[in-house]
């Protein structure tokens, strides 16, 4: 399968970055949200790039191509390239050495599937060759995307143990992309480990909740969160009918926005 051809793939800034990072003629790969959104027909905003090159080599190659390289997350292998006013996040392939639910210690790798295995959901682990547009799918992300099914890669409990924020990301991604019931294994794992959210900073939780509430209709996902007691450990003051009240508010706001002025 291929990415649909689109103007963003022909962006001269992207072409410059891709050409600078070729290894033995092979380009780096686009990964994550850009691939997912392109396949869904959603406008692509941010383009993230994965490469087997280590950060020092990424910086060297970018600078040789007169592209600004900013070491925004160099300990985790991430360099931000600034080309023609556009920014691209470039990350070296990685494997997790240890995790504590808040942060991971990583080491760099050269295996694409190993890098994919450390990601959260199957449709976020899709890679694409920016030149041939070939898609690389290691965990059946394409079929899950087609079915609008949000599924953790491998064992849901293990994915949550690696990063507790994935509990809330599950509901955000389901609210945005999912159809039907939330994946049963994912929901069970989220409910079991909900108390681990208390180990995270309030800033990270608040940011994720803002993202959830910014989707078109977050109310059903919020209600599932409430029904499963996931807010109880860190937001006990939220009333049980908050989901239905949020749905009513969205309905009123939608109706108000659609009225002729």
Locate predicted features:
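Catalytic cores of the polymerase beta-like nucleotidyltransferase superfamily
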Residues: 1-261
